[in-house]
Amino acid sequence: MLFIKPADLREIVTFPLFSDLVQCGFPSPAADYVEQRIDLNQLLIQHPSATYFVKASGDSMIDGGISDGDLLIVDSAITASHGDIVIAAVDGEFTVKKLQLRPTVQLIPMNSAYSPITISSEDTLDVFGVVIHVVKAMR
């Protein structure tokens, strides 16, 4: 698994943010096209020194919106809770899964073709962070 830390930024780059929502159906002819500026670092990264990026591999999380090749933004400053998507290692093997803490501790794939990973008292589970955003390439 390749972990990528964000580089120190020399300059903040902002991008246009249009105030209207984009209709997935028929667009409104009365749309207002006022724009603002948005800093993607400010939007996507809450804890810069504890945030890293990792590329997803495989299809075990496809029903959770994570596809092969997606870039995951992971915050290691957040304490993982029941239901969070996490980067974890079970006995040294890395995976991205949904964390279940009750009634038993399990790492749940979000694809019915895969089985949950039950964590027993003999297993070592290390959680390396919570996935907070997924960056998808559309082409």
Curated annotation (Swiss-Prot):
Induction description: Repressed by LexA, induced by DNA damage. Induced 1.5-fold by hydroxyurea.
Give its E.C. classification number.
3.4.21.-
Tell me where the transmembrane regions lie. Answer: none
Task: Give this protein's Gene Ontology molecular function annotations.
Answer: ATP-dependent activity, acting on DNA; DNA-binding transcription repressor activity; DNA-directed DNA polymerase activity; identical protein binding; nucleic acid binding; sequence-specific DNA binding; serine-type peptidase activity; single-stranded DNA binding
Q: Give the matching CDD domains.
A: S24_LexA-like
Question: What family does the entry list?
Answer: Belongs to the peptidase S24 family.
Q: Return the protein name.
A: Protein UmuD
| Protein's organism | Escherichia coli (strain K12)
